[in-house]
Regions:
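Conserved structural position within tetratricopeptide repeats
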Residues: 14-18, 51-52
Length: 72
């Protein structure tokens, strides 16, 4: 994510998910974007959607675990 313009980067991730709603990678990117901008609940939603499409992604599993740990 672009640290100089995180909201613009987030909009690009959102457009990517709009164009490719069943892409695990697009959903992961949006989840990471929300994570980087401090929107943890939204990040969890999209990371979990990504994982539902591609359950064999250890990186996304780790991101979800980290977010859930920080939320508790």
């Amino acid at each position: 994510i672009d640290n100089e313009q995180p909201e613009i980067a987030l909009q690009i991730f959102e457009m990517n998910v709009y164009a490719y709603p069943k892409s695990a990678r697009a959903l992961q990117g949006l989840g990471e974007g929300y994570m980087e901008t401090g929107k943890k609940e939204a990040a969890l939603v999209y990371l979990k959607k990504s994982l539902s499409i591609n359950a064999d992604n250890p990186f996304v599993n780790e991101l979800i675990s980290d977010l859930e740990e920080k939320n508790n």
